[in-house]
Amino acid sequence: YVQAYFEYDGKKSGGVTKSHLRFGDEPIRSSYLVRHADFVACHNKAYVANYDMVSDLKDGGSFLLACDWADVAALDAHLPVAMRRAIAQKHINLYVIDSVAIAAELGLGNRTNTILQAAFFHITGIIPDDKAVEYMKAAALKSYGKKGEKVVNMNYAAVDRGICGAVKIDYPASWAELTDETPAPRKDVPEFVTKIMEPVNNMHGDELPVSAFVGLEDGTWPQATSKYEKRGVAVKVPAWDASKCVQCNLCSYVCPHAAIRPFLLTEEE
């Protein structure tokens, strides 16, 4: 028996999706989201700075982080203090896997799902690794068989790399004693951003009291707030090469966020 619930944010490409999965030998009648998880995976390393992903993990649970931080020193530099402390206090089994690099090496672009799914089966041990590989390769053949042998083989390789690619981190016990850092004061940031927009973007909107919206009863929100929500979720960021630009303006035309704004000017202007 399998049950799945999903949470989404309001963004388009690169938005946050939370998948709540339960499975077992008996019918599942839990009509609520998972709040005591045995396994949690974070598929984008940028999320560690904004989202609380370990508070719902059981003591002794497993946390898989897709990142290129392969040792304790790198994790010390990038993981928030609260996350490291919770990991140590709950005796969480911490794993990392550089799924982005593996996908790029195999020619899969930014498609890391197969790699991370294989890592999930290996870490949880719900079925033997050889059976997981067998079932996943059968699913890949069914899904991608029409796209040719090359695509199928790339997904086969992704399964093989994912099943053995996760590295367990032996973090120091001192993580459990870490104290919170004092956040640096932020200047010129509107109260609306800190009290409403950022909690909503960090998936804590349900916790806001009604009093937080005093003055916004008609549903209107301030304008020009997108500059405060740079998510940093992209693996690669494009750069404009002036020497190759023919000024066709197609980039601006297709951009849904008006990130590129062309101006038609004369030499004098």
Language-model features: where?
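Active-site cofactor/cluster-binding pocket
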Residues: 1-202
